[in-house]
């Protein structure tokens, strides 16, 4: 069986976990590795944000509930959109709020994602990162479809490929074979749990390594990308980084999809030979998490920070001045939680009349841009 590694972390697993991993020298590498300033800076910033996070959550829990609902919708939409699974905004909102039933395969998968996302939000402390639980999450992800392989590891080989402009299919990466998959996932989970238990490496570095290896194994016939993002949330929450409940990490990934795939392509080179360097993917994920924390702190400020109550006009104006490019009324409302639609509309109208903003288009296609 081919060996599965989390880069720098391969070493003998404790006796309770039987694993094909045998490079014990790599234990020393992770403990003594000299990370560059970019990685260290990201980790330090996220640690600081985590410290402030507790204060925000204790001071204004009720006000943050609106952020939770917005993030759920954005996460469900974005993670599925990355995979080409879509529906209308109106249908999406109804599905997430459990006000309708799915009409087609895409909506079935969207509803499944919403359910697993809710499960992780509410029960992350009780979902161990183990093969059996991962299979259950996959089963629930595809619960509303008639796919027979839901909740099972892949039974046929899969490849990560792309279609060239000429129409030719180009293979980017060949994951492990089906017969190798169960043992590989078992080894991956055992290694993760053992390293975490021994506190050998910061979880912020360990989690991206796990996700990279998970994607290289590609354990399922379908749903690997969505499962990887759900597992990212699960592991972050379990380690105290709950920003994904309030700011959509999946949306941040979807908005930087090209960088996401580029980082994966760099990090999976020579993976089968255990000579890959996961640093590009680690840096990408740290940048995403850091960005989400910065967004979180800005939005927390909006929904109740400071001694003086900020008006909708002041908040929308602040958002508009910081925003690059055009934006819609919906985007302004999402960035300024705590204010009703009419307040956002009035603020946009006043800012347009004052010449701060320029209105582009009409009806549903209306956008605003800073003058």
Task: State what each model feature region is.
Residues 2-371:
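FIC/Doc superfamily catalytic core
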């Amino acid at each position: 069986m081919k060996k599965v590694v989390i880069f720098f972390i391969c070493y003998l697993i404790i006796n309770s976990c039987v694993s094909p991993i045998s490079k014990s020298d790599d234990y020393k590498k992770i403990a003594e590795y000299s990370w560059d300033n970019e990685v260290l800076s990201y980790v330090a910033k996220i640690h600081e944000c985590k410290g402030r996070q507790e204060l925000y959550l204790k001071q204004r829990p009720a006000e943050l509930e609106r952020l939770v609902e917005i993030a759920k919708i954005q996460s469900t939409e974005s993670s599925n959109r990355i995979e080409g699974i879509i529906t209308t905004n109106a249908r999406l909102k109804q599905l997430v709020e459990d006000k309708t039933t799915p009409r087609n395969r895409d909506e079935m998968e969207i509803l499944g994602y919403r359910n697993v996302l809710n499960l992780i939000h509410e029960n992350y402390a009780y979902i161990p990162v183990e093969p059996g639980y991962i299979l259950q999450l996959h089963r629930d992800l595809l619960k509303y479809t008639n796919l027979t392989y839901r909740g099972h590891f892949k039974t046929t080989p899969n490849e990560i490929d792309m279609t060239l402009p000429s129409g030719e299919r180009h293979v980017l990466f060949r994951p492990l074979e089906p017969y190798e998959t169960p043992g590989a996932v078992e080894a991956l989970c055992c290694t993760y749990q053992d390293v975490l238990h021994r506190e050998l490496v910061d979880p912020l570095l360990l989690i991206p390594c796990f996700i990279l290896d998970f994607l290289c194994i590609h354990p399922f016939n379908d749903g690997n990308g969505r499962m990887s993002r759900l597992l990212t949330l699960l592991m972050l929450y379990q380690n105290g980084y709950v920003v994904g409940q309030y700011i959509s990490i999946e949306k941040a990934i979807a908005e930087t999809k090209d960088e996401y795939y580029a980082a994966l392509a760099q990090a999976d080179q020579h993976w089968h030979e255990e000579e890959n360097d996961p640093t590009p993917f680690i840096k990408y994920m740290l940048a995403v998490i850091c960005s989400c924390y910065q967004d979180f702190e800005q939005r927390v400020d909006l929904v109740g920070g400071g001694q003086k109550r900020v008006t909708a006009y002041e908040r929308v104006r602040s958002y508009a001045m910081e925003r690059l490019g055009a934006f819609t009324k919906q985007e302004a409302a999402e960035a300024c939680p705590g204010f009703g639609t009419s307040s956002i509309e009035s603020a946009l109208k006043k800012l347009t009349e004052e010449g701060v903003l320029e209105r582009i288009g009409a009806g549903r296609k209306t956008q605003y841009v800073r003058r």
